[in-house]
Amino acid sequence: DIRFNRNVLLAVDDSANARRAVAYVGFMLGGLEGFRVTLLHVISVPEEDYFARVEEKEKWLEDYRRKIESLLAEYRRELIGAGFPESLIQTRAPQRYCPSIAECILKELESTECGTIVVGRQGLSRKEEFLFGSVSSKIVGHARNCAVWVVA
């Protein structure tokens, strides 16, 4: 069953297109009654053998989490400035092992009550997109029971 509700999952990173997606959601929905936004950034945990020592991995994760929390706070402020009540904006930065970021985002979508997912389109060439696929293309192709907004 498709979910018709006013809960929006806004998957972000620090790219220009993610910033545009945040601005677009603010422009389109800010100030309207009842919309709830969850800002999501999945922290992709590197393979076990990526770091020489456990301490290096822990430091990297700590530094990266701090950077992402700052980014999510910035996006949250932007949405508040666009008219969203503070109480209706949630931030999430789960750590997951993600061979595919799109799959991890879709797993997060399943665990929420969001009827809409919003992503920024990656700036890939047609050749790169054909070879590797893009996160937004994979989300459009695999998302079920929700609306998908791709902001370019």
Summary of predicted features, one role per range:
Residues 55-60, 88-91:
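Short glycine/proline- and acidic residue-enriched helix-loop micro-motifs
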Residues 80-117, 137:
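Structural beta-alpha unit
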Residues 18, 98-99, 129-132:
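A conditional alpha-helix N-cap/helix-loop micro-motif detector
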Residues 2-58, 81-82:
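Small/aliphatic-rich secondary-structure junction motif
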Residues 38-40, 89-94, 149:
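General small-molecule cofactor/ligand-binding pocket signal
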Residues 1, 109-152:
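Gly/Ser-rich helix-loop-strand patches that form or flank binding pockets
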Residues 58-70:
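A short acidic, glycine-rich active-site loop
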Residues 35, 87, 145-146:
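A structural micro-motif
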